[in-house]
Amino acid sequence: MLKNLESPIIKIIDFGSACDERQTVYTYIQSRFYRSPEVLLGLPYSSAIDIWSLGCIVVELFLGLPLFPGSSEYNQVSRIVEMLGTPPNWMIEVGKQAGDFFEKRQDEFGRKTYHLKSMEQYSRERGTKEQPSKKYFQANTLPEIIKTYPMPRKNMKQSEIDRGKHPAWLRWARQS
C-alpha cells in the first residue's frame, strides 16, 4: 500500500496466504499478476516466490502498470515466456501443471525441448475460450520497457521524468 502520494514510503499489507516456509499447504497462492512461475507450473515453492512478487510490484510502482497483467493462468504464463523465455526443462518436467501450458518436442538432434502451447491449442484442450489480452508495452524485455515507456504525464516533476532513463534501474533489470 502506498502510504502517501508525496512520499515513496510503502507499507506491506495482506498476509492472508502467509505460511511457514516448511509448511507450504496452499496450491492457489499469490495474486495472478504477481504469481511466480513455480506456482503457475505447480512446483514446490519457497520464499523465493515472494521475491518474484516483490520484483513485479516494484516494476509496477515504477511504471504505473503491471508487468504481467495476465487475464488467465495461460495468459500469465505466455506473458512471462514472451519476456523471459521458456522455463528450464527441469521446471517443466517437475511442475504438476506444466503440461497444461507446454508440449514436449524433439529437436533435430533428438533432444527434448518444450514449447508453449498456442492459445488455440490450450483453449481446445481445456475447453476454455482464451482471448488475447491487452498489451501495455510494445517492448518485450524489461530494459527495453524502461528505456522506451513514455513516462512524462501531466504534473510530473522533472526528477520523475528522469527516472525512466536512470541507469540503476537498467542495471537491476539486466541482472534480474
Regions found by a protein language model. Give the residues of each.
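Conserved protein kinase catalytic/activation segment
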Residues: M1-I12
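End-of-activation segment of Hanks-type protein kinase domains
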Residues: C19, E38-L43, L61
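Conserved activation segment of eukaryotic-like protein kinases, specifically the C-terminal portion
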Residues: V25-V39
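Activation segment
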Residues: G42-S47, F68
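Conserved catalytic-loop aspartate of Hanks-type protein kinases
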Residues: D50
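C-terminal lobe substrate-recognition/regulatory segment of protein kinase catalytic domains
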Residues: P88-R174
